[in-house]
Design a protein with these regions (language model features):
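HIT superfamily nucleotide-processing domains
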Residues: 1-138
Length: 138
């Protein structure tokens, strides 16, 4: 993994507004927030994408992500939020270090806007083959 802004934050070379830290995870406010309280949750392990993250780091994030989300909601007064996690440039990952966005959604206009354009023509036969392939890859 190349040098990232998150690596510099983890080393203390760039300041951040920390909201949580333990041995495996750091959470801090996003400097380009989509809404008030937009928080980034990152592993201290230098993995680029979620599939490259160790099980231990993934478990550490999984344990604290709900807790941090509850704190963001309480502090901002929002009642809805999105959790966003992008993997790779095609998926709009801007910083090549695994990170989760907790983005409060205080109103219809504020926060993350999401469009959903599902594939047309779901094929159950193809889905069965794909499901077996995914299960076999586990």
């Amino acid at each position: 993994m190349g040098e990232t802004v998150f690596a510099k934050i983890l080393r203390g070379e760039i300041p951040c507004h920390r909201v949580y830290e333990d041995d495996h995870v750091l959470a801090f406010l996003d400097v380009g927030p989509l809404s008030r309280g937009h928080t980034l949750v990152i592993p201290k392990e230098p993995a680029v994408t979620l599939d490259a993250l160790s099980d231990d780091s993934a478990a550490a994030i999984g344990r604290v992500l709900p807790r941090i989300a509850r704190a963001v909601l309480k502090a901002t007064g929002a009642t809805a939020f999105n959790v966003l996690q992008n993997n790779g440039p095609l998926a709009h990952q801007a910083v090549m270090h695994v990170h989760f966005h907790i983005i409060p959604k205080p109103s219809a206009d504020a926060g993350l806007g999401v469009g959903w354009d599902p594939l047309v023509g779901f094929d159950h036969g193809e889905a069965a083959v794909l499901a077996r392939a995914i299960a076999a890859a586990l």
